[in-house]
Amino acid sequence: GWHDFKLFRAIPLDQLKLTVYDDFRAPERLFGRVETRDGRSLEGVLVYDLDEAMDFELLDGQNGNISYRIPFKYVREIEPKNYKYTWVKLSGGTELVLGGMYDVMATNDGILIFRTGGEVVYVRWRDVKRIELWTKGKQND
């Protein structure tokens, strides 16, 4: 309902920037760094929740009555806070606390990191402290 809105601003349709097919013309692998609760920092190509590996795939979560499906292309940081909720920072600076879906809860299957040199590391979700995502070769904006 309306109580879920922080702000409503009406704008002309020609000023509305919606995601379109061409925004994903050249899909990329997820690339980033996983910091673990025991202090390790692991960088490489990532597979999130063991099934999302490309920037056009979606991070699913809920906040109150609002459901989010955010392309990983727009996700910059992910930080599990407890078994039910995760903090997420988007490329535009927006911060969300999401829960209610497997991607952002203790039911997440963990992260695979394909490191330079061929080493593959699996990190359980409960061991993840923080994840940073960026386009390969370019760290966060």
Where are these regions (language model features)?
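Compositionally biased alpha-helical segments
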Residues: G1-D141
